Amino acid sequence: MLNSESDNGYKAQLYKRTNHGHVEFVYAFAGTDDWSDVVDDIDQYYGGSPNQYKMAVANAEILSSILKEKYGNNVDFAFVGHSLGGGEVAAASMATGFDAITFNPAAVTSDDLLGNPSHITNNIALGTKLFTIWGKDVYYGGDMLHNFQSNTNVDIPGAINYIQLGTGATHTIDDFYNYFYKDHDE
């Protein structure tokens, strides 16, 4: 496991596992957890290129190059992230061409971070649909970040997988964990 943490708030870890003789890597990015992250969220929303995003792309390019060199071009390598980390992994995927799986991601709006979004799958928490107005569905609960971004015409890159998490659903990664692992022991 490789851990990346910086003074600017960037946090990511590389995980490796061997599954039936096949080596797999996941580079996981942390979401917003302090005010410096919120500043980067706002900067990115308005088209800036925060240092965390630049660092995410630079590290992803270095790691993908090293892994390709060691394991070949078909290395099993993917990115995963939530919120701010979701935006960072989307940018990393567009820079490297490797798959990204996001959960309630921040949009990527900076032109110098955009690329081919075909390898990005975004998982968005939905609450309970209340009504539709002006062609937009209005939900109670669900991901407030995605609701804000879509209502201000800011699109997230890649495919979107809406997951009905129910009335109490929020922006947290815990909601997805509880959905996917309904029968887990606490």
Feature-to-residue mapping (PLM):
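A conserved cap/lid and substrate-binding interface adjacent to the catalytic center
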Residues: 1-79, 95-96, 106-115
